[in-house]
Amino acid sequence: MKKVLIAMVFLLTAAVSIAADKKSGTIVMEFDLSAHPENGEAKLWVPYPVSDADQLISNIRIEGDYAESAVYTDREHSTPMLFARWNEGAESRRLSFSFDVERDEVLVRDLQGGEKAWNRNDFAPWLEPTRLGPTDGVVKALADDIVEGRTTVLGKARAVYDWTVENMFRDPDTRGCGPGDVCALLQTRGGKCGDIHSVYVALARSAGVPAREVFGIRQGRKDGQDLTGWQHCWAEFYLPGTGWIPVDPGDVRKMMLREKLELDDEKTAEYRAYFWGGIDPYRVKLSTGRDLILNPPQQGDPVNYLMYPFAQIGGETLDWLDPEGFSYRITYRQ
């Protein structure tokens, strides 16, 4: 399995060598909104990582010519975000945000089917539908079919994982990480990590399994590497008596595409086993939560997720999937 992990991380990040249990570095995010029209306030929200059991965030540095800046959370998901504002007419609108990260490999193995009693009400936020991830209709019908005969949270979560690996595929033409429109995806079956894990989460929730997406970015392998398009998300389900368990069927399908693997190949089985309860350390968790009302609130609809920077100038939203037009860059430092 160690050789499998090394091969997996090499292909995901083109790393020459790895430490299988930890990965550290510095992430630098640079924004320059100066070229956009000056007719209105400029507001910028950036996902703000925090330390947890699997990652240590330190040495945070925020610099810029903004009129105000602060770190807030939203009210529903407690998603941290860095907010900055520039006054109308400001000719220069720049911000630099960097932090050091030390990330652990997560391996939750020997999962058991016996589960402690749990109260669904305690996990209501992770059982509810989202705007693009319903838990009724065709999604519920499919989930019921997938978990038929399974009576435990673990059994249902595994059945949904297996179905997702076997029936979804990675579509490299998808823009960004994908919007995660579950009903559309059940028709096309193709997308990137945001799509594949939205399907997993919606099906798991429909089957009564608490689940959530985790939005982040991959770490690089060498100093100065451009990470601007390296956003990645994965999923977690809650196993009573154990806690949140990571799964990444999206990376299984990514490896299958890169290595031209079929479902019945031995390497596919190895990746499939690794990403059930395991994730590599070459990533940083940035946020969770869908359908966000930012803080301060943005104008318009809820934000689908906060994995990319979000900005509005005079109330008009910039395209966060166009880094050049938006004008931001993310760099890895060692």
Sequence positions of predicted segments:
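Sec-dependent N-terminal signal peptides
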Residues: 4-13
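Intrinsically disordered, low-complexity N-terminal segments that are enriched in acidic
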Residues: 19-107
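A short, structured loop/turn motif at beta-sheet edges
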Residues: 37-39, 88-93, 151, 205-207, ...
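A mature extracytoplasmic/lumenal domain signature
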Residues: 48-50, 99-103, 113-115, 215-217, ...
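Secondary-structure boundary elements
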Residues: 93-191, 314, 318-334
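Conserved structured core elements
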Residues: 154, 158, 190-194, 198, ...
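Hydrophobic/aromatic-rich core segments of domains that either
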Residues: 198-298
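Short hairpin/turn module used for nucleic-acid contact or packing/dimerization
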Residues: 280-334
